[in-house]
Curated annotation (Swiss-Prot):
Part of the 50S ribosomal subunit. Contacts protein L32. The lineage of its organism: Bacteria, Pseudomonadati, Pseudomonadota, Gammaproteobacteria, Enterobacterales. Belongs to the bacterial ribosomal protein bL17 family. GO terms for molecular function: structural constituent of ribosome. The keyword Ribonucleoprotein applies. InterPro entries: Ribosomal_bL17 (IPR000456), Ribosomal_bL17_CS (IPR047859), Ribosomal_bL17_sf (IPR036373). Keywords: Ribonucleoprotein, Ribosomal protein. Disulfide bonds: none annotated. This is Large ribosomal subunit protein bL17. PANTHER family: LARGE RIBOSOMAL SUBUNIT PROTEIN BL17M, RIBOSOMAL PROTEIN L17. One of its GO terms (biological process) is translation. One of its GO terms (cellular component) is cytosolic large ribosomal subunit.
Length: 125
């Protein structure tokens, strides 16, 4: 009997879960929108929001902390040059989850997770 579910396991090991979240973070930073299952989108939101908050202040320490989580130089550069300055005045809530039906094979609920005001972000870049 699991009273408080602290971690959704997704039937994966811990390292596989971490790699999955890291890959989804990189994809969201580079593409501004991704399609995934609803539960994965909710987990991704928990991890990406603090990263974007830290990317609003461009210091070497923040760059190193984010690089330690993401381990992708292209996404770190994009975070600090485009996404961080774009969300500088916003106190939080950088992502939006939009439900988009069910997957054909297993009827899993699907969702788009996107950065808020992504059209303005794409025009700048």
């Amino acid at each position: 009997m699991k009273h408080q579910k602290r971690v959704l396991k997704f039937n994966r090991s811990g390292s596989h879960r971490d790699a999955m979240v890291k890959n989804m973070m990189i994809a969201l930073i580079l593409n501004h929108i991704i399609k995934t299952t609803l539960s994965k989108a909710k987990i991704l939101r928990q991890f990406i929001e603090p990263v974007i908050t830290r990317a609003k202040i461009n210091t070497i320490a923040n760059r190193r902390l984010i690089f330690a989580k993401i381990r992708n130089t292209d996404s770190v550069i994009k975070l600090f040059t485009q996404i961080g300055p774009h969300f500088y005045d916003r106190p939080g809530g950088y992502t939006r989850i939009l439900k988009c039906g069910f997957r054909k094979g297993d009827n899993a609920p699907m969702a788009y997770i996107e950065l808020v005001d992504r059209s303005k972000l794409v025009i700048k870049s």
